[in-house]
Amino acid sequence: MGDVKLVTSTRVSKTSLTLSPSVPAEAPAFTLPPRNIRVQLGATARFEGKVRGYPEPQITWYRNGHPLPEGDHYVVDHSIRGIFSLVIKGVQEGDSGKYTCEAANDGGVRQVTVELTVEGNSLKKYSLPSSAKTPGGRLSVPPVEHRPSIWGESPPKFATKPNRVVVREGQTGRFSCKITGRPQPQVTWTKGDIHLQQNERFNMFEKTGIQYLEIQNVQLADAGIYTCTVVNSAGKASVSAELTVQGPDKTDTHAQPLCMPPKPTTLATKAIENSDFKQATSNGIAKELKSTSTELMVETKDRLSAKKETFYTSREAKDGKQGQNQEANAVPLQESRGTKGPQVLQKTSSTITLQAVKAQPEPKAEPQTTFIRQAEDRKRTVQPLMTTTTQENPSLTGQVSPRSRETENRAGVRKSVKEEKREPLGIPPQFESRPQSLEASEGQEIKFKSKVSGKPKPDVEWFKEGVPIKTGEGIQIYEEDGTHCLWLKKACLGDSGSYSCAAFNPRGQTSTSWLLTVKRPKVEEVAPCFSSVLKGCTVSEGQDFVLQCYVGGVPVPEITWLLNEQPIQYAHSTFEAGVAKLTVQDALPEDDGIYTCLAENNAGRASCSAQVTVKEKKSSKKAEGTQAAKLNKTFAPIFLKGLTDLKVMDGSQVIMTVEVSANPCPEIIWLHNGKEIQETEDFHFEKKGNEYSLYIQEVFPEDTGKYTCEAWNELGETQTQATLTVQEPQDGIQPWFISKPRSVTAAAGQNVLISCAIAGDPFPTVHWFKDGQEITPGTGCEILQNEDIFTLILRNVQSRHAGQYEIQLRNQVGECSCQVSLMLRESSASRAEMLRDGRESASSGERRDGGNYGALTFGRTSGFKKSSSETRAAEEEQEDVRGVLKRRVETREHTEESLRQQEAEQLDFRDILGKKVSTKSFSEEDLKEIPAEQMDFRANLQRQVKPKTLSEEERKVHAPQQVDFRSVLAKKGTPKTPLPEKVPPPKPAVTDFRSVLGAKKKPPAENGSASTPAPNARAGSEAQNATPNSEAPAPKPVVKKEEKNDRKCEHGCAVVDGGIIGKKAENKPAASKPTPPPSKGTAPSFTEKLQDAKVADGEKLVLQCRISSDPPASVSWTLDSKAIKSSKSIVISQEGTLCSLTIEKVMPEDGGEYKCIAENAAGKAECACKVLVEDTSSTKAAKPAEKKTKKPKTTLPPVLSTESSEATVKKKPAPKTPPKAATPPQITQFPEDRKVRAGESVELFAKVVGTAPITCTWMKFRKQIQENEYIKIENAENSSKLTISSTKQEHCGCYTLVVENKLGSRQAQVNLTVVDKPDPPAGTPCASDIRSSSLTLSWYGSSYDGGSAVQSYTVEIWNSVDNKWTDLTTCRSTSFNVQDLQADREYKFRVRAANVYGISEPSQESEVVKVGEKQEEELKEEEAELSDDEGKETEVNYRTVTINTEQKVSDVYNIEERLGSGKFGQVFRLVEKKTGKVWAGKFFKAYSAKEKENIRDEISIMNCLHHPKLVQCVDAFEEKANIVMVLEMVSGGELFERIIDEDFELTERECIKYMRQISEGVEYIHKQGIVHLDLKPENIMCVNKTGTSIKLIDFGLARRLESAGSLKVLFGTPEFVAPEVINYEPIGYETDMWSIGVICYILVSGLSPFMGDNDNETLANVTSATWDFDDEAFDEISDDAKDFISNLLKKDMKSRLNCTQCLQHPWLQKDTKNMEAKKLSKDRMKKYMARRKWQKTGHAVRAIGRLSSMAMISGMSGRKASGSSPTSPINADKVENEDAFLEEVAEEKPHVKPYFTKTILDMEVVEGSAARFDCKIEGYPDPEVMWYKDDQPVKESRHFQIDYDEEGNCSLTISEVCGDDDAKYTCKAVNSLGEATCTAELLVETMGKEGEGEGEGEEDEEEEEE
């Protein structure tokens, strides 16, 4: 027989491993990498981190490549749990630099590099808004060394990993992954050990931050393992994925064999560092044999008669990790290309030795090689290698060509295959009839038949999921009358899947595929029913007692126990074999009361109750009489419930609760690491009775630490402590069960299999436990793995095997477990014994840490034998049941995408949610197994839906209703499932603190967010999953009592007997009684029926009826025969016998026939009513109390009134009266922006309201204002006043008032402008273009315009003859052509600036200049030097453009093809009708006055910019919402696109030419007092495709500096924007110089200095302003070029060169004619352009204030109260939507016509999601609002919902958007003074229409000016 042996080695040792369930080697991974740190000179530096891996990794620290010597200076520590540190004592200057930490073990090596910065005494200020928490945070800013570094290096990581790809031959395969790391990692793709090179078939590229490998026209030979390796200076990472290539009819080559569990294979492995395997390659891949990492050696002992052999390679388990029970499957060589090779280390090569032996060939078959696995009895035969087939299928045959044999020889393979070159005659196989896909029920007999023709007669094989099927138990394959049959005698669920049949003969082969779906038959549901009920009892204090009852139902009911209607905390409960039992040990007086057993399943609920009386011990003399005395007894505090350690994820909410008993009442304080916690917005304290809670709204890593609760009163004090660990999210997915294991009932001597399928990323480790003890494989017990399926096999089971089995899954993200029971049947056992055994194993069904917290809810298990000693042990474990329940928090980290994928895979939600079984018939055996199959769907819900923390108000609304959890799953686009006829009745809603912990706070997205908050999933779905001790407020469970007598249960049945048990007596069962059959009860009937109703549109509708039934009926509602589900607007509830349906705000579509349907096991009843909804448009005005929802008597002008009959007119609701409850602060009065003359005084007065105490703080530029001799602040209870007595220029700026109280904060801003005469023009006037009698004089604008625009400049002249200053001219621009100068005189010039407030002092004097012939000759020489290739630039007559409103653009120009598009609109080619000249037309859509004003400003700015290097505007037109700018045509394309052209040679000389021109153009812009603010590669255009002339375009973001005062902006392209913009600091001309520096850096190197993986990272890089020339790209670049860039990329804007200095810089002064022209590589530039092209799609210019990492700078301008808090501006949107309390101050409000402070924005949404337009309207009287869709009024409905609140926020929400909603939407606000409108477009992306985005023409912008 043949042996398979896989041999590998490492540098360290050679080993032979048996790949069994022993612990696998795991490469090291830094779970907490050390961070960069800064320390003071002489201080101690400490690098800390944590590493994991197996075996325990060894840590070594290196500096400059050398290991650090340990001693007094360097102290290295490494603990057993992976925590390590490096301490450097007494840090000196020489210690600064980079340190490398290396973690190594047998699994691999991982490195991370960190930097130590040693600072002198002047510590630099750490000011990084992108990385810091929100300003004014609740805790002090952590020390620098503990902050995550944003400028340091970080090792590469895979944010997403490539998945396995399955493609058909000839198709395109694509792997993708997302990587992070700094510096940007280098990416390489390999197949085996061969590096892939780019060619026409293999394309490696990066797109929007995602790395792709694309393989065109995939061949069978391309199959195999592909590895992506990423490397940077901080480390290295790699990940592999498999490409599987299918033949034409193949579906999957890696599926599981039918009903055949795999067995472990012993493999010996040898890992080597580098493969010596070499082959002739093309494209870096071996030409024929593609599995390059595997060498094959065949030792043939007995050759087969045909001298043919098949080569096999091993296939590893799904997760690709060594040692996880790998299995070597026999796969033909050709197929091995599509399978994973074993990955021992990152680089491995494997050797497989195969020894072929003689095998008995089957009749009518070719000779075969049999692959024997060690330790396996059954043999699997594999089809031999076919050498002469005409058509091949990779799963059946691998054709070996002479070329491949040549390759094999080179690879060292000994060959024993003789090729037979004969051409057989005959006919290839053909299917005459094929099997068809079918659906079958479980247990059904299935036959697939196929008829095949061919000559010679074809052989036929059957496959399931690509794996050959063999005859075995329950499977038969045979041929009958020429028809081939596959017979499955009894179908089971596991038989579902894809089947195929293949026929082959020497002439060829063919195959056909089909699907089999096996479904479980439905089982009839039966509501719970008590056959024997609870019986009351009386016990003495300290005794044990047991309550029990018998209950039946299908599916098996959930049992919940209540004491006095409250969930029981400490008792022990079981439910087995229909017996529900509650055991209370050591009864206490508080255990006295009414006990209720509540049984619930999908069909209904039932309950029964009994009274238990606990007699107190007579230890006190007169218990009753001394009760008052007891109350007065004083004692020191004691903790009844203390703190327990918690582990939570970053961003979770945490609640810590203690229970304290003390008299007198104790004082409580909370401490964090010994420091008292103050109550703030983030930390809340709460007291409920004896319970005290600390709420942390959102935890951060710095919240980790020891928390202490101290309680004291005058008699003493006590404390309790616990540790909170905040974990940062791990990449990946928590383990979960694809298919859970089932409980098994077996007879002694049988073999038992317990199987499950699992998933998780990284793939989880699996541990099996029996009764808490880990199982180790041994005699009679095996643990197998086949990919993701794990199986426990128990052979010849005996009574000792019975028990509780647990499967635990773990990975770095989390863990998951599942319990099943194994029970043995004993035929002699009586029913009574079975029940007794069940009671003895009371603890088996409980799993406290598995996810059931709170009201004790237990799984169901049938009874099994257990020895009395085991029983006692179990009881002893349960002894301390009153102790604190341990809390365990498990969170799952998911990307939205992975959640969607996971949900999409869950085709039948019932398989996941509770294994709800719906079958028609069931065998008795099947019914026994059902209880164990009930899964806890709540765990799955928790995984899928992020629970929402409910307000008290919402709890009241939602608590009694049953939420259909299927609607939750359907939310994200899974197929909607029709509502079943039976809706489960309500369940008690008990809040679960875990859902609070798991709730991530997400501010609601505005204006088009498709994310709808998850409905109240907990109210129904998680009701049983909650704890009475939960740290969230828990409303009482709704349990309706209707008993009239304590001794009767809810249904009037007799009460069961309970037992009194001696203190330590053994639990003895009550006398067993035969269980009577469950009674059917009475059918439902309506005691009160529904009444017809007539209701006005917008009013509230309540329908009610009463139902009588026994058992209680399940109730459902329909409208016009369509099922109704509870939703935000429709509330369905059931309280006892009363059922109601409530619609808060009725819409016209709510009219129709409503039916209430009640159903139980005994029957069904229904009643109906009609509801008529009246349209109120024709009725009288609404009542004042309902202003918000009804149309009031309108004050609209006649135009709007006529429209209002078809449209919804919304009136602003009246401000609310002050609520009695506490309210957050509000700013009710605030000053407008102010402008004052210098020296005048100014008062800023604000009124505030809210719950006292309120603190008012005035801030300027994020710093608190301190009082001084000029500034005074007066704060009163409800007002605040800031007074500046004598204003100066430095008092200009934005003043922010922040008001705060315990409930929140508000802020508002006002801009103060101090006006004066301008400053003198900056710098020195400059003379240029000096001729014989003329020159051009130019100058800079004023550095400060005095708060009013500079209107003109006065030029003064001095000459050497007159020797005095005289006025020469007055002009508006910053240049003037001076004429009529005389050659014999010297001249000087100076300039003054004038605004409305006066004329400035004169500027500096110019240099002395003379005019004459010499200068003119030099000018001619310079002109002659212009290079020929530039040619003459197109002459454009400079024009001052005024917008033409009389004509259309088409009257003057012919509009031709479109040249591009962007957010502004589109660009078309225009031809002037008169002259035939070609121009570019930029067509804008401008709906609002603001948009039109912006475009007019752009035209106005371009009128000032007449320069050869700037594109010119020659005409402009305006017609309604369209504005057209006619621009000079620049046809050469973008500069960077020109550079990467094949015919363009890039040298440093070209770079100098381009940078000169850019500097000249920008210099002129600056001289006009203008900043461009959007300099980037896309805005630098080539004049033509041959020369090197360029022009700057796009002045849409340009601003006048001289008229803006201290100008701040919040827009720009992150990659090119300057730090001062991000920090929201005043900008200047230097802001453009930074952008020029970035462009120059990219131009010379092809690398971007600041680009990160996303905008936030890019902005963080810019803010830190750290960059370097370390890359090899700069090796060829001159020092002058580097110096030029260095002088531009300076964080301090004052230190940057200006344009004039740039032009005088040595680099730009170089002689480009004679300088050496060294060719620069364009590869990096090509990559940069490819990445940029993807990145800029749709968002080239971003409003930086909207980026979350820039949250600190948002809300810094704008007048009104923004609703954002200074500590958390990111929540502004959320706070703004709160119902705010505003005091009405009518007498102070002037009448104002409506205007929008926030307009609606264009948006794009996917079909089926929701869209929302938001705006904010101001005006007085309060405006009324109407919405229009394409100029048609919108009527409010379920589809269109309009909200308008008292703050003026108005929104239009469109639910379930469809293609028809793609339109232009307008919001119109009207009052008696006038109207205002704003318009936006909704673009609906229908599915399957991706990739339609056009290129962005010249501009793509989004501007936010506040």
Swiss-Prot record:
Domain Fibronectin type-III: 1321-1414
IIB- repeat ranges per the UniProt record: 693-708, 791-807, 1140-1156, 1281-1297, 1851-1866
GO biological process per UniProt: tonic smooth muscle contraction
Active site positions: D1574 (proton acceptor)
Polar residues bias: start-end ranges: 345-354, 384-402
UniProt feature, compositional bias: Acidic residues: 1415-1432, 1893-1906
Ligand binding (ATP): L1459, G1460, S1461, G1462, K1463, F1464, G1465, Q1466, V1467, K1482
Residues recorded with modification Phosphoserine: S1762, S1768
IIA- repeat segments: 660-676, 758-774, 1107-1123, 1817-1833
Ranges where the record places region 5 X repeats, motif IIB: 693-1866
Renumbered residue ranges of the record's region Calmodulin-binding: 1700-1763
Post-translational modification: The C-terminus is deglutamylated, leading to the formation of Myosin light chain kinase, smooth muscle, deglutamylated form. The C-terminus is variable, with one to five C-terminal glutamyl residues being removed producing five forms differring in their number of C-terminal glutamyl residues.
Required cofactor names: Mg(2+); Ca(2+)
Region (4 X repeats, motif IIA): 660-1833
Residue ranges, compositional bias (Pro residues): 977-988
Segments for region (Motif IB): 1385-1402
Sequence segments annotated as region (Disordered): 127-157, 309-453, 831-881, 947-1086, 1180-1227, 1414-1433, 1885-1906
Cleavable signal peptide: none
One cellular component (GO) term of this entry: stress fiber
The protein's role, per its UniProt record: Phosphorylates a specific serine in the N-terminus of a myosin light chain, which leads to the formation of calmodulin/MLCK signal transduction complexes which allow selective transduction of calcium signals.
UniProt subunit comment: All isoforms including Telokin bind calmodulin.
Protein name listed in UniProt: Myosin light chain kinase, smooth muscle
Source taxonomy: Eukaryota, Metazoa, Chordata, Craniata, Vertebrata
Gene field: Mylk
